[in-house]
């Protein structure tokens, strides 16, 4: 039991670091970096680099999921138990809240903008000269998040599959994959692919009256879970019957 709590604590710490550091870069870069492109690249790199850092820090303890969607995929692939899945998710949500709180403190108690996800202008419609979010925008955002999470999670499953390699470079592959989906998705949804990372800032931002992220939270929770489940199922199908490869001479 003691060893299990070490895993849960590692997940809590890892998710706190992800939320504080990566969302922190997104918020700060938005204020000091000139031009949308600079912010876009800085934010994408921040999320990817945090994953690399955490993968090689806590990966040997908990597997470094730091994302309920990843934990769901691992549950479906029978890499973790249902009990571990439940405690992982709790730890991840708590960690994300802690990370968001630390970020808010660094911003002098400003809870209004902590990196919560929102449907972006590319998916909005123009009504009377104004960009607005309609039903199509919401479901398009849901579809985008499913695809982004599918790409991210299937990269995780492939790079950590011990049947094909030892996984020592998995952290780099996973970090680059998260950078990729951020580069692709920031203009559509702000890129979630992680329910915990989206829920925490949405809850805290709501305290200041900024409820947009919270009103769309069903997207940031359900879409990543759906994308992760799809990735786990598809990966299982395309690798079924594969045996562990022999080392090359």
Locations of regions flagged by a protein language model:
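Membrane-interface helix-loop junctions and terminal tails of multi-pass membrane proteins
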Residues: 1-249
């Amino acid at each position: 039991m003691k060893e299990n709590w070490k895993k849960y604590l590692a997940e809590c710490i890892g998710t706190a670091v992800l939320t504080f550091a990566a969302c922190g870069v997104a918020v700060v870069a938005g204020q000091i970096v000139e031009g949308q492109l600079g912010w876009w690249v800085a934010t994408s790199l921040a999320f990817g680099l945090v994953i690399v850092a955490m993968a090689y820090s806590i990966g040997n303890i908990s597997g470094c999921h730091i994302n309920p969607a990843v934990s769901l995929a691992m549950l479906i692939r029978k890499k973790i138990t249902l009990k571990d899945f439940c405690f992982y998710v709790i730890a991840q949500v708590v960690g994300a809240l802690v990370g968001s709180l630390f970020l808010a403190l660094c911003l002098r108690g400003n809870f209004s903008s902590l990196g919560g996800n929102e449907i972006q202008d590319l998916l909005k419609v123009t009504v009377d000269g104004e960009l607005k979010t309609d039903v199509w925008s919401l479901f398009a955002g849901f579809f985008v998040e499913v695809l982004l999470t599918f790409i991210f999670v299937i990269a995780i499953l492939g790079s950590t599959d011990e049947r094909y390699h030892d996984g020592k470079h998995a952290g780099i592959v996973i970090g680059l994959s998260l950078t990729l989906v951020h580069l692709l998705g920031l203009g559509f949804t702000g890129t979630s692919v992680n329910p915990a990372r989206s829920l925490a800032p949405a809850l805290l931002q709501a305290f200041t009256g900024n409820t947009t992220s919270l009103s769309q939270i069903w997207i940031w929770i359900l879409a990543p879970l759906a994308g992760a489940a799809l990735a786990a199922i598809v990966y299982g199908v395309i690798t079924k019957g594969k045996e562990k490869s022999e080392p090359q001479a």
